[in-house]
Structure formats: structure tokens, C-alpha cells
From Swiss-Prot:
GO terms for cellular component: cytoplasm; nuclear speck; nucleoplasm; nucleus. GO terms for molecular function: kinase binding; promoter-specific chromatin binding; protein heterodimerization activity; protein homodimerization activity. This is Growth arrest and DNA damage-inducible protein GADD45 alpha. GO terms for biological process: apoptotic process; cellular response to ionizing radiation; cellular response to mechanical stimulus; centrosome cycle; DNA repair; negative regulation of angiogenesis; negative regulation of blood vessel endothelial cell migration; negative regulation of peptidyl-serine phosphorylation of STAT protein. Keywords: Cell cycle, DNA damage, Growth arrest, Nucleus, Phosphoprotein. Pfam families: Ribosomal_L7Ae. It is found in: Nucleus. PANTHER family: GROWTH ARREST AND DNA DAMAGE-INDUCIBLE PROTEIN GADD45, GROWTH ARREST AND DNA DAMAGE-INDUCIBLE PROTEIN GADD45 ALPHA.
């Protein structure tokens, strides 16, 4: 391995870490502003009704989910719809970490302790633009820039790994 190859690999890792951190920040803000939709079915409904307000689509699957044909068909349809409507898409390779980020608030609720509720479907997550104001969020801007750069390199659905804490 040459110095240039090592340096390029190190820069790519650092860049991916920054993108992962930006995604965590965007998800945290979206949760607090209630501008997040979770679940393949719920996401499909929202995309059908109001695609113009969706700013980011996350698709999360692990190795086991890659063998789920029905889920892969849903992913393909959602990806096609998002590409057609200029919605930024990211694929998250560690859905467990995504679940940790999204379920922090619901774990404290009474239903979680009773175990009566089925865990939510976290395979698709949409972040919408709040109607009250345009997002002037540097973390969201960084994610949108990353998605745009990935598309320029013919990587239409970039895969990121959320950093473990």
C-alpha cells in the first residue's frame, strides 16, 4: 500500500465518520421536532401523499434482511420513487444502532416495560421538512451534499455505518 492509498483510505474513513455524526444529529433533531416517519408501510403512505416535504430517506437492513425478498422489493420501489422525486437516500448498514437512536424516547414509556407492543419496523425512516420553517441545519446540509456527491460518482444509494457509542 502506498502513502497515497493509505492517506485516501484514512480520509474516506474520516469523512464517513463525519457523515455518520451528521446523520445522528439530523435524526435527533427530527425526533424532537416530530418530523420523522418510521416503517416501510408508513413511509410508502407518506411518500404517496406528500413527497415534496421529504428531505431524507434511510433504508436500514442487515445481512439477514438481505435474504428477505419482500423487503428487497419494497426497498427497490422506495429507492425508485425517491430517485424520481429527488429525495436523498442513504442505506444504513447497522440497523441496531439506528434502533438505539430512534427508540430512546419510546423505551421509557409504559408500553415498553409491559412488552405488549411489537417493535416498530425500522427498515425505512423518512425525515420531513418542518412546515414552520426551512431547515437551515448544517448537519442536514452535510448529508445532502454527501448524497449529491455520491450520485455524481454513480452511487445512487450510498451505504453508511452509524458510529457506535
Amino acid at each position: 500500500m502506498t502513502l497515497e492509498e493509505f492517506s485516501a483510505g484514512e480520509q474516506k474513513t474520516e469523512r464517513m465518520d463525519k457523515v455518520g455524526d451528521a446523520l445522528e444529529e439530523v435524526l435527533s433533531k427530527a425526533l424532537s421536532q416530530r418530523t420523522i416517519t418510521v416503517g416501510v408501510y408508513e413511509a410508502a403512505k407518506l411518500l404517496n401523499v406528500d413527497p415534496d416535504n421529504v428531505v431524507l430517506c434511510l433504508l436500514a437492513a442487515d445481512e439477514d434482511d438481505d435474504r428477505d425478498v419482500a423487503l428487497q422489493i419494497h426497498f427497490t420501489l422506495i429507492q425508485a420513487f425517491c430517485c424520481e422525486n429527488d429525495i436523498n437516500i442513504l442505506r444504513v448498514s447497522n440497523p441496531g444502532r439506528l434502533a438505539e437512536l430512534l427508540l430512546l424516547e419510546t423505551d421509557a414509556g409504559p408500553a415498553a416495560s409491559e412488552g405488549a407492543e411489537q417493535p416498530p419496523d425500522l427498515h425505512c425512516v423518512l425525515v420531513t421538512n418542518p412546515h414552520s420553517s426551512q431547515w437551515k441545519d448544517p448537519a442536514l446540509s452535510q448529508l445532502i451534499c454527501f448524497c449529491r456527491e455520491s450520485r455524481y460518482m454513480d452511487q445512487w444509494v450510498p451505504v453508511i455505518n452509524l458510529p457506535e457509542r
